[in-house]
């Protein structure tokens, strides 16, 4: 007989997942009578694996075969890992996690986070639909203002051209532009509103040399090719009038070398390189002035900053006209923090507090590629949620699990485990506003991922597109992925152009210009269908997630709220799945109905409401 404990089962642990400080956590463990246990102890370790506290269980009731042991406790705010010690008259053994159950002496430790009692996220972000735009690549209105554009640059004469993937004659990279601007985004707000967008996430708009603009030249100035501060204010005002919020990309771990602050090219006159007495000199770490300095991933165009330098913190966060204050007053509703794992916790927490002072319902999300609840960076356990630093993160573990499942590389069991791990490890309010992205500026285009595993040179990838057969495969995989994206908790995020079938391998090919006039209307129809399904369902937007079945090529789960239950079934197996009498199907592909009985054909899917 096995020892019974499942941290995801309310019989054995409440509350589910994270616990607020001051709130009690209740645990139960069932030990066979044949084990003759005389003492059971929960051993809690801190985030660094050091002993923190031992919590005894009390012998509670008995069943025919088991003794039920219970405990109640609370811990200080923080991230913990725990296991059990079971003592018997003739010795003791340790108990660890194995899947949903337990295992003696080997396995993983359970994770438990105590979060701030007042942890909250903006209401507007819960379940909202996000749309990500790389501003240079979306839409252009009027002529580009090149008067103050940092040089040299290259302008595409044809919006359908492939992004350049080689350096220019002087060895410069990422300096080709298409001319997309803020006025262009503003003009397309009716399209975005009709699509169902509620949050606009803009990749960097600050003045910079490159087209991606992650090499900031001036934090308080719009890149002249994108427009003016007035253009940004107008965009925010019109977006707000249409029920949308606007989130900016904040790049604060490094600046550009060609910037007001560093001025390696001696363009601005008062940077750390061009002026040894520069007020920005203390922001940077020079090993040998002025040419040898600390840079992001050793890229000389991206000098790292010392984020904890008081003058830098004041400039970005605390001053009356700080960078945060400047953009919030112009209309921004929050920030995404680029490479947040390279920003010190003190910086992130101070940023969050100041942002909320300026706009109490502002959103702060971070770029994290792993499970953010237990993320370690440079040997330090990050406190994104245990200190309430972030409201949300980019949900890449979720993305990877969905792609592997839909492509047949993993089964429903693996996907279900990932979904349950995320739900258990993240605070429930964070779960509702996770940035659930299937594609971003840092990944290959979704249609390409689903249709082509080609691994050639950049020159080969530049003009490679799906064949008709590959496209059919990609479309067959796209719908189940979209159904998962728009029926699971969080903010489903669409990267501009994915909804109309834009193709491309990794950067820079995933950053083509939006194909206005050449949209794939059949793919757009799929997006509209799942967006409408979510928008019309209270359960799909904000209901509790309950996993029902996960195995083989199949997965089923529920979203439950007071007024409605939505049941989602996806069958990626090669056999018919008998569902029984589940309710009224509202959305389906490959559904077989026989009276009240439902079944799904191979590669079928459906959503049922009760």
Task: Cite the ranges covered by each PLM segment.
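Substrate-binding/active-site clefts of carbohydrate-active enzymes
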Residues: 134-198, 205-330, 351-358
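Conserved, mostly hydrophobic/aromatic
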Residues: 29, 133, 192, 202, ...
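C-terminal beta-strand-rich structural cap/linker in extracellular carbohydrate-active enzymes
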Residues: 31-33, 80, 595-610
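Aromatic/acidic polysaccharide-binding cleft in carbohydrate-active enzymes
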Residues: 136, 378-379, 385, 435-466, ...
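The feature marks proteins involved in alpha-glucan
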Residues: 1-24, 48-132, 138-158, 164-165
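Active-site-proximal helices and loops of the catalytic beta/alpha 8
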Residues: 236-245, 253-254, 259-270, 333, ...
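Beta-strand-rich binding/interaction modules
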Residues: 29, 36-53, 80-82, 575-593
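Carbohydrate-binding surface patches
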Residues: 14, 26, 548-582
């Amino acid at each position: 007989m096995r020892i019974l404990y499942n941290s995801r089962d309310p019989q054995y642990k409440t509350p589910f997942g994270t616990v607020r400080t001051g709130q009690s956590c209740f645990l139960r463990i069932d030990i066979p009578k044949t084990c003759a246990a005389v003492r059971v102890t929960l051993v809690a370790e801190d985030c660094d694996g050091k002993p923190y506290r031992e919590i005894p269980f009390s012998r509670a009731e008995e069943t025919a075969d088991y003794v039920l042991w219970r405990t109640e406790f609370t811990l200080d705010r923080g991230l913990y890992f725990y296991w059990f010690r079971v003592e018997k008259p003739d010795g003791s053994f340790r108990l660890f996690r194995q899947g949903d159950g337990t295992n003696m002496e080997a396995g993983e430790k359970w994770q438990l986070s105590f979060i701030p009692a007042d942890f909250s996220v903006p209401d507007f972000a819960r379940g909202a639909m996000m749309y990500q735009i790389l501003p240079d690549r979306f839409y252009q209105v009027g002529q580009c203002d090149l008067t103050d554009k940092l040089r040299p640059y290259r302008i595409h004469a044809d919006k359908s051209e492939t992004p350049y993937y080689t350096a220019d004659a002087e060895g410069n990279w990422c300096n080709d532009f298409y001319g997309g601007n803020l006025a262009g985004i503003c003009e397309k707000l009716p399209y975005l509103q009709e699509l169902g967008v509620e949050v606009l996430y803009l990749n960097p708009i600050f003045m910079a040399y490159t087209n991606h603009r992650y090499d900031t030249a001036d934090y308080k100035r719009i890149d002249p090719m994108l427009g003016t501060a007035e253009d940004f204010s107008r965009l925010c005002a019109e977006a707000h009038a249409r029920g949308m919020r606007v989130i900016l990309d904040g790049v604060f771990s490094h600046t550009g070398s060609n910037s007001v602050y560093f001025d390696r090219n001696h363009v601005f006159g008062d940077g750390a390189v061009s002026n040894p007495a520069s007020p920005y000199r203390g922001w940077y770490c020079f090993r040998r002035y002025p040419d040898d300095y600390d840079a992001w991933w050793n890229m000389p165009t991206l000098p790292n900053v010392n984020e904890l330098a008081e003058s830098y913190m004041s400039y970005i966060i605390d001053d009356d006209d700080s960078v945060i204050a400047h953009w919030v007053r112009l209309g921004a509703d929050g920030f995404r923090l680029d490479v947040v794992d390279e920003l010190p916790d003190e910086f992130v927490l101070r940023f969050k507090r100041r942002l909320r002072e300026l706009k109490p319902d502002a959103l702060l999300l971070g770029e994290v590629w792993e499970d953010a609840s237990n993320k370690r960076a440079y040997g330090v356990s990050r406190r994104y949620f245990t200190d309430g630093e972030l409201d949300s993160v980019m949900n890449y573990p979720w993305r990877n699990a969905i792609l592997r499942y839909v492509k047949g590389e993993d089964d429903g069991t693996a996907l279900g485990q990932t979904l349950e791990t995320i739900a258990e490890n993240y605070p429930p309010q964070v779960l509702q506003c996770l940035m659930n992205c299937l594609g971003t500026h840092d990944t290959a285009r979704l249609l390409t991922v689903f249709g082509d595993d080609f691994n050639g040179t950049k020159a080969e990838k530049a003009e490679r597109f799906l064949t008709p057969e590959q496209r059919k495969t990609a479309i067959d995989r796209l719908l189940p992925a979209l159904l998962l994206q728009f029926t699971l908790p969080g903010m489903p995020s669409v990267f501009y152009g994915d909804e109309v079938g834009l193709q491309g391998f990794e950067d820079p090919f995933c950053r083509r210009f939006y194909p206005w006039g050449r949209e794939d209307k059949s793919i757009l129809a799929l997006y509209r269908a799942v967006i409408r399904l979510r928008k019309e369902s209270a359960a799909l937007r904000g209901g509790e997630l309950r996993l029902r079945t996960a195995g083989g090529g199949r997965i089923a789960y529920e979203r439950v709220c007071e007024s409605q239950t939505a049941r989602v079934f996806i069958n990626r197996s090669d056999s018919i799945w008998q569902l029984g009498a589940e309710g009224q199907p509202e959305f389906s592909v490959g559904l077989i109905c026989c009276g009240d009985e439902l079944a799904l054909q191979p590669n079928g899917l459906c959503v049922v409401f009760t």
